[in-house]
Amino acid sequence: MYQGHMQGKGSRAADKAVAMVMKEIPREESAEEKPLLTMTSQLVNEQQESRPLLSPSIDDFLCETKSEAIAKPVTSNTAVLTTGLDLLDLSEPVSQTQTKAKKSESSSKSSSLKKKADGSDLISADAEQRAQALRGPETSSLDLDIQTQLEKWDDVKFHGDRTSKGHLMAERKSCSSRAGSKELLWSSEHRSQPELSTGKSALNSESASELELVAPAQARLTKEHRWGSALLSRNHSLEEEFERAKAAVESDTEFWDKMQAEWEEMARRNWISENQEAQNQVTVSASEKGYYFHTENPFKDWPGAFEEGLKRLKEGDLPVTILFMEAAILQDPGNAEAWQFLGITQAENENEQAAIVALQRCLELQPNNLKALMALAVSYTNTSHQQDACEALKNWIKQNPKYKYLVKNKKGSPGLTRRMSKSPVDSSVLEGVKDLYLEAAHQNGDMIDPDLQTGLGVLFHLSGEFNRAIDAFNAALTVRPEDYSLWNRLGATLANGDRSEEAVEAYTRALEIQPGFIRSRYNLGISCINLGAYREAVSNFLTALSLQRKSRNQQQVPHPAISGNIWAALRIALSLMDQPELFQAANLGDLDVLLRAFNLDP
């Protein structure tokens, strides 16, 4: 039934981790196989893989590129692959037409210069080279191994020393247009005076051509600025989306922190404030001490409410038993036995606070009530009130006719008196009470007192000696094998001793004897969580809540007597199952939705 126990403890920490689901983005290439589109696809994918899936997919970028039929400018988010790559010529064929027009215009100007320069071959070559220099800014080179300007100048000088003037002109034509300014200087040094005057007119024509190129360059800069603004806007929106996702993850982390705090609070189960003055005041009423009666109890005028309550307790109907006991107390506030059974039933119904108040009131009315003293010691232990638990167990010895002489004999011992008079909780106080119980057990010899063994088991539980506590409870069970409360205490000790598998067996035995034992059902769910059987844990918690509600509905009780820590444990189990929609139902207290989800009868 609890097949998940092998990985239980190891999986609890892993279940609390916040996982982010990532999705691989498919890479697509342009159908036209343009270099620009291919490069843009690669760059966007590289950028996409560097952060979570929070930005638009690569398809969005490709669609925009195809629709605009232009290339995206190189921005800070885009890597430059080569220094000689001009993206504009790859996507705008219009610029080639403009270049040809400017080339023809420059050629016509060059021909006019030839007529004015007496047909000199050198001037013709120089004018043609200047026309190439004008076309240089509008032309891109895909060559990655371009010579530097200084190397080209050295090449020109080297060939000039060894070859004729005609060979010099041919070599200069093979150089890149990027050396235009230096070539103009070289021409001016080797020309005659008429050639220089002709060169001035050529420079004037070059200035005019540059002015004609300013407008297209500014238009291109404006378009690039617009593209850059669009990309910056996109990046800004992506940053906002990332911040929203980050906030969602942080809220998810807060959820797990809240679950951890709730788990620790449930483990402490320390909801009772220590009020020593209220404990010593016998004349204080029950309502003033914190017990809250059901305001609309349908049995408040029921004749023989106490006897009817005992009958319902044997049947295992704990919520209705509580109502009958409250009715009996309202009819007779001094009925100590009714307070006793009310406290014991509240503890079995997983309401420790009300149990402690009722048992305290019982002992105020009847200080020698041994059952109330033992039940109060167990409730104090469950709420981590060790000093109060030790005092209750000591009072059990003092009020017991069989063992009270042990306390009188120990009064002559200064060491015991000093240890028992200390108010702070320390090991000496616990050891002093434990010595009393061990001596009482030794006095009994082979005879086993189940109540004494129960008290000894509680003391060993308080000191963390779980194996010895288990032995004490097992000894008590040899005398009372049908005592479901003893089976439950044995299961709790086994669970605290890291023996959850055996604890499940003890709880199961307690529920076989008393199916309506809600505390044992709750403890069984906690052991299932420790074993990693989260679904079984949820089933047990829902069964306990359903039992509480069923009794309330049958008797038409308007105010539910449902334990809050059962709901807290249920939320923890649902969170470990990774069921957010069911966890939300638990937060809303929607028991019907949860029962249907786990196929349980309402």
From Swiss-Prot:
Gene Ontology BP annotations: maintenance of protein location; positive regulation of corticotropin secretion; protein import into peroxisome matrix, docking; regulated exocytosis; regulation of membrane potential
Tissue: Brain specific.
Membrane association type: Peripheral membrane protein
Domain of life: Eukaryota
Compartmental location: Cytoplasm; Membrane
This protein's record includes keyword Chaperone: no
Positions bearing Phosphoserine: S181, S229, S233, S237, S421, S423
Region (Disordered), start-end ranges: 94-140, 167-206
InterPro entries: PEX5/PEX5L, TPR-like_helical_dom_sf, TPR_rpt
TPR repeats: 302-335, 336-369, 371-403, 450-483, 485-517, 519-551
Main location: cytoplasm
Keywords noted in UniProt: Cytoplasm, Membrane, Phosphoprotein, Repeat, TPR repeat
GO molecular function: intracellularly cyclic nucleotide-activated monoatomic cation channel activity; peroxisome matrix targeting signal-1 binding; peroxisome targeting sequence binding; small GTPase binding
GO cellular component: cell tip; cytoplasm; cytosol; dendrite; intracellular cyclic nucleotide activated cation channel complex; perinuclear region of cytoplasm; peroxisomal membrane; receptor complex
Signal peptide positions (record): none
Free-text function comment from the UniProt entry: Accessory subunit of hyperpolarization-activated cyclic nucleotide-gated (HCN) channels, regulating their cell-surface expression and cyclic nucleotide dependence.
Entry similarity comment: Belongs to the peroxisomal targeting signal receptor family.
Subunit structure of this chain's protein: Forms an obligate 4:4 complex with HCN2. Interacts with RAB8B. Interacts with HCN3. Interacts with HCN4 with a 4:4 HCN4:PEX5L stoichiometry; reduces the effects of cAMP on the voltage-dependence and rate of activation of HCN4.
UniProt name for this protein: PEX5-related protein
Organism name: Rattus norvegicus
Gene behind this protein: Pex5l
